[in-house]
Amino acid sequence: METTQTLRFKTKALAVLSKCYDHAQTHLKGGVLQVNLLSVNYGGPRLAAVANAGTAGLISFEVSPDAVAEWQNHQSPEEAPAAVSFRNLAYGRTCVLGKELFGSAVEQASLQFYKRPQGGSRPEFVKLTMEYDDKVSKSHHTCALMPYMPPASDRLRNEQMIGQVLLMPKTASSLQKWARQQGSGGVKVTLNPDLYVTTYTSGEACLTLDYKPLSVGPYEAFTGPVAKAQDSGAVEAHVVCSVAADSLAAALSLCRIPAVSVPILRFYRSGIIAVVAGLLTSAGDLPLDLSVILFNHASEEAAASTASEPEDKSPRVQPLGTGLQQRPRHTVSPSPSPPPPPRTPTWESPARPETPSPAIPSHSSNTALERPLAVQLARKRTSSEARQKQKHPKKVKQAFNPLI
């Protein structure tokens, strides 16, 4: 095996984030651990835990390069990948690597990536080694790397931010409760810089939150720790976004850590919203960048209304003969007409031949011959029944009364 990269962490810096990781481990448990190698040019490699947030959200629990003690790259810059990823939950579901890595009992932790000599230039396996503070225990976790995934932190690098809105804990809690009530449907978010309000709409439900405008631009606002959490924002343009309600609720819950951070909503011109954890001054200097990207999500209400609209299947009015000119004459068939109602069987006299017919008896007439056969039979049946009733009249039964 050939070693491609080696990474050693500052375990004390990771242990400081144990409370933050425990707050988000429910979502991060089924995700991946990713090492961003593109960020080497921006200060060093970054370790991040990446997972999904609801229907259309992406969580990035990223550790700053300050938590990396040593980094060695045994490949050339052309051969090294942009990022390497592996599962957070080990096979067998017996060990969560992230929980062990951010634990307070770890004294040394390192990652080693390697590949087979006959393989390509990309690393194929990773080995996580941890030594505990009892000077005796030591653990090794080896697994295969996942297919290439782009770094989560670089998805918004080329996006233009047009506004930021900070939510105080009470406001974020009310918005989170409202978003949970909407289920997994779509939420239309409107940011109005003229009225200093943010409107959230889902079907007939609507929630309006106001904020205090700041005198700086979006890129200059909230650059440092938050000293006082209050509803404020720096917005330079009007924007309308559509996000998933469950993803919005999960993002607000993740970025609102008690006594550590408050959520900050970042609006981009492309319609994407990123909920970022703004660290409080009381939390100290934590090497953490926690964010949830909310992608565009078409609301179920709009999809349902589109699907429920009946299609206009009525034929269009066309000039006479238009349909006959579009296909050959022998293929045109008249429009089907409803079948005629059942008719009473009648007897008709045959057509008279040219030769003289025999004389008709005197007791029959043309009127009798043309009369329907069913009518004649019905009359005969009625007359015979009447004669039977006259011959045998119905006898009246007398009931016996013992009191007489």
From Swiss-Prot:
Transmembrane segments: none
GO biological process, one term: symbiont-mediated perturbation of host cell cycle G1/S transition checkpoint
Biased composition range(s): Pro residues: 335-344
UniProt subcellular location: Virion tegument; Host nucleus
Region of interest (Homodimerization), ranges: 1-300
Pfam family, one: Herpes_DNAp_acc
Gene Ontology MF: a single term: DNA binding
Modified residues (Phosphoserine): S337, S349
Record-linked InterPro entries: DNA_pol_proc_fac_herpes (IPR007013)
Chain spans, region Transcriptional activation: 301-404
Domain of life assignment: Viruses
Transcription regulation recorded as keyword: yes
Entry keyword set: Activator, Disulfide bond, DNA-binding, Early protein, G1/S host cell cycle checkpoint dysregulation by virus, Host nucleus, Host-virus interaction, Modulation of host cell cycle by virus, Phosphoprotein, Transcription, Transcription regulation, Virion, Virion tegument
PTM summary: Phosphorylated by the viral BGLF4 kinase.
One cellular-component annotation, GO: viral tegument
Domain notes: The N-terminus is important for dimerization, DNA binding, and DNA polymerase processivity. The C-terminus mediates transcriptional activation.
Homology family: Belongs to the herpesviridae DNA polymerase accessory subunit family.
Biological function: Acts as a DNA polymerase processivity factor; a transcriptional activator for several EBV promoters and inhibits the host DNA damage response (DDR) to double-stranded DNA breaks. Plays an essential role in the viral lytic DNA replication by acting as a polymerase accessory subunit. Stimulates the viral DNA polymerase activity and appears to function with it as a holoenzyme. Increases the processivity of the viral polymerase, probably by acting as a sliding clamp that prevents dissociation of the polymerase from the active template.
Protein's name according to its UniProt entry: DNA polymerase processivity factor BMRF1
Native species: Epstein-Barr virus (strain GD1) (HHV-4)
Lineage of the organism: Viruses, Duplodnaviria, Heunggongvirae, Peploviricota, Herviviricetes
